[in-house]
Amino acid sequence: MLPSTIQTLTLFLTSGGVLLSLYVSASLSYLLYSDILLKFSSKITAPTMTLDCANASNVQAVNRSATKEMTFLLPEPEWTYPRLSCQGSTFQKALLISPHRFGEARGNSAPLIIREPFIACGPKECKHFALTHYAAQPGGYYNGTREDRNKLRHLISVKLGKIPTVENSIFHMAAWSGSACHDGREWTYIGVDGPDSNALIKIKYGEAYTDTYHSYANNILRTQESACNCIGGDCYLMITDGSASGISKCRFLKIREGRIIKEIFPTGRVEHTEECTCGFASNKTIECACRDNSYTAKRPFVKLNVETDTAEIRLMCTETYLDTPRPDDGSITGPCESNGDKGRGGIKGGFVHQRMASKIGRWYSRTMSKTERMGMELYVRYDGDPWTDSDALAHSGVMVSMKEPGWYSFGFEIKDKKCDVPCIGIEMVHDGGKKTWHSAATAIYCLMGSGQLLWDTVTGVDMAL
């Protein structure tokens, strides 16, 4: 790899080591020596020396210094690739971000009103993203905070573990739908906004706004509401455009350093695919568990080959139906592609891979309630093919009880030194209806250790206070 970052440092050298001149006044200087062995090519230039003495006739100046200019070549950070998952056989509660437990704070310390949270990680840090209504609680701008789309919504982030307050949050761009991912060198941010009939995807790479993508069905162009996925500098983003109660065909955008370099048009069962949660099954394949808001309670499942840039969609065949609302498990008859009933409506689902040397685990989340966005459970299936395996998924534990809200969920992976830690995040919405504020907490569960998932999460928020 050829480095592209070149930094030039000029050091003043003497025979004993490195000489740093610190000018304390117009006529005084102090010399600091350190023993450093430097092995770089250099060039010598004539020095400049100024003497300022009260009795210059009694001073003999001997110049034994020279200016030595050296060029340090700093390599670019490496592109990221999926690695084996860190060891573990169960998920445990890792973190709760419940901003409105601090709802008595005002001003810059006030928590932002948010929804659609997700988490994305780079090599050195994870960021907690969300879509804010440009309002805080407490405050006077609660009206409209239950709306999905308006002109005030923005994609924001904080470092994972920070509370998304006015003071802590970075505002990335105007957006009512969003995604983000890190390619190993820089962050890519995705935001969608505009009128329903002509929405626009905007891409930001680092601090620069770099590209756009226009609506292709003129019916609420939108994206994942979770992290996009990068390998070798290429980042893959799922988008869709179409009716919430009819046809909505998805596409994938291949993005490199903030610019779209290819469109991918999936084949197969393409009638309705939205809000995909995606991750790497291997260095060759991205898999996504998605939402069909129109026809079925089964999840559309995408396999995207990053070597050929082709994608295919089929319905998950398991008798454990993962959408909400949904019929009784196992009640849909016929082949795997059968839609069944209770397919209208839906919810974004959590999905993450556990990559092991000899097998792969696929972890999923779904609400405990079959009809309401309440509770959240964890399921797993090792190996097999989600397109053809009809058996029930293995139940792994309760992350959110039936008494607590369980709305959107998502997957992400934390980068350890030599392996990746799979995690699932859960949006726990404080639903105040249309008369007061409407916002969310985030619960996080990660793979760690063995045994059973031990404890569920509560938000601890009373909206009446």
Curated annotation (Swiss-Prot):
Q: Which cysteines does the record link by disulfide bonds?
A: 86-419, 121-126, 181-228, 230-235, 276-290, 278-288, 317-336, 423-446
Query: What is the regulatory mechanism acting on its activity?
Result: Inhibited by the neuraminidase inhibitors zanamivir (Relenza) and oseltamivir (Tamiflu). These drugs interfere with the release of progeny virus from infected cells and are effective against all influenza strains. Resistance to neuraminidase inhibitors is quite rare.
Where is the chain membrane-spanning? 12-34
The answer to keyword Transmembrane applying to this record is: yes
Know the name of this protein? Answer: Neuraminidase
The record's active-site residues are: 148, 408
Query: What EC class does the entry list?
Result: hydrolase
What does it catalyze?
Answer: Hydrolysis of alpha-(2->3)-, alpha-(2->6)-, alpha-(2->8)- glycosidic linkages of terminal sialic acid residues in oligosaccharides, glycoproteins, glycolipids, colominic acid and synthetic substrates
Question: Where is this chain glycosylated?
Answer: 55, 63, 143, 283
What topology does it adopt in the membrane? Single-pass type II membrane protein
Q: GO annotations under biological process?
A: carbohydrate metabolic process; viral budding from plasma membrane
The miscellaneous remark of the record is: The influenza B genome consist of 8 RNA segments. Genetic variation of hemagglutinin and/or neuraminidase genes results in the emergence of new influenza strains. The mechanism of variation can be the result of point mutations or the result of genetic reassortment between segments of two different strains.
Specify the species. Answer: Influenza B virus (strain B/Beijing/1/1987)
PTM note says: N-glycosylated.
Segment Hypervariable stalk region: which positions?
38-85
Q: Which cofactor does it need?
A: Ca(2+)
Where in or outside the cell is it found?
Virion membrane; Host apical cell membrane
Q: Where is this region: Involved in apical transport and lipid raft association?
A: 13-35
